[in-house]
């Protein structure tokens, strides 16, 4: 019975090869998006290609609904890939956001799709919101530019200024309802921005495609916004969604029975606008071949996409400012900077600048020792790239990593590789090093030296470096009558050092242990 069922399912499967819809190789990147996008996504009937068209009349934005296994991802891949074949990156830009716990858009990031400006994989809501904010900024920028040119829309602007590149933009958000899973300020702002993009994007060449397994329920977009999206594409979905995506008297979506079978409707769901079609099938290996060909065709003429991968740590090797600093020590002006990671937003990398002012120290707090070690090491790399000196005097490292830990010796190896062989101080010499560094701070503060060159003390595992911990019997009495201990010297460096160019970068596992190690002040 099982075999009969599988055979029946296979017999019902319809497969339209992607080659049926893709343009010939000599026509790649020849399309003009001045008046809109026109991209084949499947086969309607025996020989006709089903076109996805936006930019003309009321057909400006699209809503796609399809339950798991319906072929929604296949549809998105066919659309994105064929659009990238039809139009050059000068004509079309893509902003791709995937809220699912999957990797639907990862291949576009790995192969650096030249049309993509932003690719979000397993995206956080905050990053998705920043994409909407960026596109809202595009609306304002283009609005100002169009007014100066005396035109009303993208087509008119392209005619008035044919030499100025102004690509048409398509925003694709899969599982868009994730914006609204919480009734908070972020969800409210996302709803307002999406509504603005849908209502105003038409004139400025910005189009929106929203996909979801279900568009019903509380976690969805306002009906007034959905009503502005004339293009509806339904794959297999529930009866409730079949009525929601089309009009109440259009129940055709309930009759869809196989994966990839879909209805294209560009009349706000009116039954007379239904067009039954089969989504083109694009295997992963074929898609990868196409993307590699597109990357070769781009030949480095276009910037790589901004990629946000929610489940992946930031890759320091991909830091553009750090790479520039490594290539040229003078590439970054101003105070010393360490880069800490990627923001959950479209903006420059998260960084900390060590200015010569009180409090300019960096505290890392948290129990993820691997992450803290990565941050400390990345900081050493950035500073070593900035201050290329044969001496390691500008940086001192106290490593509190246990000798039997898997990460033991990582900081010492990193320092050696960076040409800082004496940076990591043996534990028996911590007190001596603190005395010397505190003395340097005092000499600078008193004006006994003109040296203000930056110096850094890295403490990895503040809670484990015993010499730094404040004495349990230190109640503040008689301090003038005794020599300051290592803990007190460390406190002086933290308090007085930044103003004279001596800074501390310290990691501690918990706030409780931090208070045990050093005074709150």
Regions found by a protein language model. Give the residues of each.
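Extended alpha-helical interface modules used as scaffolds for assembling large macromolecular complexes
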Residues: 6-23, 284-340, 347, 382, ...
């Amino acid at each position: 019975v099982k075999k009969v069922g599988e055979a029946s399912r296979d017999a019902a499967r319809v497969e339209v090869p992607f080659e049926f819809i893709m343009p010939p190789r000599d026509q790649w990147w020849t399309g003009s998006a001045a008046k809109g996008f026109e991209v084949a996504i499947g086969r309607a009937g025996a020989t006709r290609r089903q076109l996805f068209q936006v930019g003309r009349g009321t057909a400006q934005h699209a809503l796609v609904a399809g339950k798991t296994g319906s072929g929604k991802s296949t549809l998105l891949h066919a659309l994105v890939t064929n659009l990238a074949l039809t139009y050059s990156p000068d004509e079309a830009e893509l902003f791709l956001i995937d809220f699912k716990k999957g990797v639907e858009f990862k291949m576009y990031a790995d192969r650096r799709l030249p049309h993509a400006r932003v690719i979000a994989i397993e995206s956080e809501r905050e990053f998705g919101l920043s994409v909407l904010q960026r596109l809202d900024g595009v609306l304002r920028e283009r609005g100002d530019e169009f007014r100066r040119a005396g035109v009303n829309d993208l087509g008119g602007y392209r005619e008035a200024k044919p030499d100025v590149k102004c690509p048409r933009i398509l925003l694709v958000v899969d599982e868009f309802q994730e914006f609204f899973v919480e009734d908070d300020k972020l969800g409210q702002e996302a709803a307002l921005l999406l509504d603005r993009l849908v209502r105003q994007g038409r004139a400025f060449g910005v189009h929106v495609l929203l996909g979801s397994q279900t568009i019903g329920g509380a976690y969805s977009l306002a009906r007034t916004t959905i009503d502005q999206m004339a293009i509806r594409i339904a794959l297999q979905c529930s009866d409730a969604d079949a009525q929601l995506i089309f009009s109440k008297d259009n129940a055709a979506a309930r009759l869809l029975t196989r994966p990839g079978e879909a209805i294209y409707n560009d009349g706000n769901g009116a039954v007379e606008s239904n067009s039954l079609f089969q989504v083109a099938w694009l295997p992963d290996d074929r898609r990868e071949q196409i993307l590699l060909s597109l990357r070769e065709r781009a030949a480095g003429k276009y910037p790589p996409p901004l990629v946000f991968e929610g489940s992946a740590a930031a890759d320091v090797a991909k830091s553009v400012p750090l790479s520039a600093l490594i290539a040229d020590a003078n590439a970054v002006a101003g105070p010393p900077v360490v880069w800490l990671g990627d923001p959950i937003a479209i903006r420059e990398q998260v960084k900390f600048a060590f200015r010569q002012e009180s409090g300019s120290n960096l505290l890392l707090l948290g129990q993820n020792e691997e992450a803290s070690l990565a941050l400390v090491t990345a900081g050493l790399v950035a500073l070593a790239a900035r201050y290329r000196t044969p001496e390691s005097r500008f940086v001192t490292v106290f490593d509190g990593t246990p000798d039997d830990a898997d990460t033991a010796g990582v900081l010492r190896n990193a320092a050696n590789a960076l040409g800082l062989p004496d940076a990591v101080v043996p534990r028996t010499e911590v007190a001596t090093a603190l005395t010397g560094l505190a003395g340097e701070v005092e000499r600078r503060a008193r004006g006994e030296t003109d040296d203000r060159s930056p110096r850094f003390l890295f403490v990895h595992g503040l809670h484990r470096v015993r010499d730094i911990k404040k004495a349990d019997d230190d109640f503040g009495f008689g301090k003038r009558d005794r020599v300051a201990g290592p803990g007190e010297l460390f406190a002086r460096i933290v308090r007085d050092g930044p103003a004279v160019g001596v800074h501390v970068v310290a990691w501690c596992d918990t706030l409780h242990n931090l208070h045990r190690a050093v005074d709150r002040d």
